[in-house]
Amino acid sequence: MPQLDTSTWLTMILSMFLTLFIIFQLKISKHNFYHNPELTPTKMLKQNTPWEAKWTKIYLPLLLPL
């Protein structure tokens, strides 16, 4: 059974990392970033809930007979 030749693996792995690094650098360099990002003011609308419109009573549960 022949022995597996691993002498070129280091070269292949390093060249792969270098290629991936260059590809990602090129992709990032073509990305358009905003120069001065500003927050857009959001107007908070208050929603009226039914229990805020009128006063409601909270009743205790009925007592059970002993």
Curated annotation (Swiss-Prot):
Record-annotated disulphide pairs: none
Secretion signal span: none
One GO BP annotation of this record: proton motive force-driven ATP synthesis
InterPro entries assigned: ATP8_mammal (IPR039017), ATP8_metazoa (IPR001421)
One Gene Ontology term of the molecular function aspect: proton transmembrane transporter activity
In-chain residues carrying the UniProt-annotated modification N6-succinyllysine: K54
Keywords of the record: Acetylation, ATP synthesis, CF(0), Hydrogen ion transport, Ion transport, Membrane, Mitochondrion, Transmembrane, Transmembrane helix, Transport
Modified residues (N6-acetyllysine): K54, K57
Family label: Belongs to the ATPase protein 8 family.
Keyword Translocase: no
Annotated TM spans: 8-24
Subunit structure of this chain's protein: Component of the ATP synthase complex composed at least of ATP5F1A/subunit alpha, ATP5F1B/subunit beta, ATP5MC1/subunit c (homooctomer), MT-ATP6/subunit a, MT-ATP8/subunit 8, ATP5ME/subunit e, ATP5MF/subunit f, ATP5MG/subunit g, ATP5MK/subunit k, ATP5MJ/subunit j, ATP5F1C/subunit gamma, ATP5F1D/subunit delta, ATP5F1E/subunit epsilon, ATP5PF/subunit F6, ATP5PB/subunit b, ATP5PD/subunit d, ATP5PO/subunit OSCP.
Protein name as it appears in the record: ATP synthase F(0) complex subunit 8
Summary of the function given for this chain in its UniProt record: Subunit 8, of the mitochondrial membrane ATP synthase complex (F(1)F(0) ATP synthase or Complex V) that produces ATP from ADP in the presence of a proton gradient across the membrane which is generated by electron transport complexes of the respiratory chain. ATP synthase complex consist of a soluble F(1) head domain - the catalytic core - and a membrane F(1) domain - the membrane proton channel. These two domains are linked by a central stalk rotating inside the F(1) region and a stationary peripheral stalk.
Topology in membrane: Single-pass membrane protein
Chief site of localization: mitochondrion
Pfam families: ATP-synt_8 (PF00895)
Cell compartments where the protein resides: Mitochondrion membrane
